[in-house]
Amino acid sequence: MPENLDDLAADLAAGRTDPVQLVERALERARASDAVFITLMEDAALADAHAARRRWTRGQPLSSHDGIPIAWKDLFDIAGTRTSAGSRTRDEAVPAGCDAPVVAATRRLGFIPIGKTNLSEFAFSGLGANPHFGTPTADLPGAPRMPGGSSSGSAVAVQRGIVPAAIGTDTAGSVRVPAAFTGCVGYKASQARYDMAGVFPLAGSLDSLGPLAGCVADCATMDAAMRGVSAQLLPLTPPQFVVDDSIIDDPAVTAPVRAHFEDVLARVSPYAPIRRQRVDAWHRAREAITTLGWLGAYEARHLHIDTLTGPKRSLVDARVLSRLDGAARISAEAAAELVAIRAREMQRLRAELAGATLILPTVKHTAPLLAPLEADPARFAEVNVATLALTMIASFLDMPGVALPTGSTADGRPLSTHLCAASGEDDRVLAQAVWLEQRLRS
C-alpha cells in the first residue's frame, strides 16, 4: 500500500524527497504494472514535477502536497489527453481542451496527474474486466482475482503503491467495490458534492465521484482538494451505527464475510452504540430495482444508443453490450416511477436513520478468481449482479459511503466494511470512518 499524503508532505517539507523523485518513482512503478493505466502522461508529469521542485526550492510551494503524484480514472478530461472511457469506440475522440474542474482544483494545490487509469468499458461493470486494455490485478496472494469495477485501475494503482491516491467514479459501486476487492479505502460522495463537468457520464441521475487511498484521512484530503476547499480536521467522536440484520442474514452473504462483519461489530460495540433495526427504505429501494429495473442501465442505454445501433457496436465488450441491450426492457414509464420512488425513499431513509450511520459489508463476497469468470460469460454476468447488490441500493438512495478495509481471510483476500449515511452527510460519514479505522487499529 502507498505512503500516506501527510507523510509525503512532511518528507517534501523536510527535503527528504522532492517532486521529481516522487513522480519518477510513480512512473517507474506504473510502467512495470500491466493494464493499470490506459494513458501515461510521462512528459507532462515530469515537467510538472520539475516546476514543483523549483517552487519548493524557492520556498513557495502551492500547498503542502505540491508535487505529489496522483492518478485519474479515464473518464475525467485532462487537457491534451483523449478520454477513452475504457472503450475502443473512442479511439478517435478529440483530446480534451481543458481539465475537468475537479482535476483543475487539485492542480491548483500542486497534485500532479501521472496518467489515466483503466476501467470497465463505459464504467458499466462491477468486476473491473476490460478486454481492450487488459484487466489490472491487485498484488494479492494466489491466483489473480477480479479487481472490482468499474474504477479498477484507480484501485490497483493505489494498492500497488504507484500513487498514494487515485480518483474514480461511482454509479452503482464503482469506487467502493474495487476498494473492497483490493484492500483500499474508497469514498463515494453524495451526488451533488462535486462539479461533474468534464467527466464522461454513465447515468446522469446516479453518477458520483470519489477518491481511493490507503487511509480515510487521505480520501478526505482529496475530497477537499477536488472541491477547492481547505481540508478540515475530522472530529473523532464515536458514531451511532445502525445494523439491519435482514441484510446480513441474506444467504448470499458468504460465511467469511458474515463472520468478519460480526467480529467488527463486536470490536466496536463497547465504544459506539449499535442500533439494530430494519431499514425499510433500503428494502423498498431493493424491491423497486428488482421489479422495475436499474435506473442506471436505462440511462446508460439511452446515452450509448448511437453506438448500440451504429457501426461501432462490434467494438464494444460483449458483456457490456449484453447489459446495455438488456436495459431495453425498462420502459420510460418504469424509469419515471423509479425516479419518484427514489425521491420518496431518500426521505424515508433520512427519517429512519435519524443521524445514525448504516454499517454493513461492502460486498457479499470476497474478490472472485479472474480466470473462471473470463471464461464463462454467463457466470460473469451472475457474479457481477451479486457484486453490486449492496452498493447499488446505497447509490439509488444517494448515500455517501466509505468502503473501509477491516481485515482479510486466511488466504489473504481483503474484507471490507461499508459505512453509509443519508444524502449530504458526507463530512459525518468520513469522520466516522476515521474513527472506525483508528478504533480497529488500536
What are the residue ranges of the model-derived segments?
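An N-terminal boundary/leader segment
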Residues: 1-47, 57, 266, 441-442
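Glycine-rich, small-residue loops and helix-cap segments
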Residues: 15, 26, 67, 73, ...
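Structural helix-boundary/capping segments
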Residues: 160, 164-248, 262, 267, ...
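Immediate post-signal peptide segment of exported/extracytoplasmic ligand-binding proteins
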Residues: 52-69, 234-241
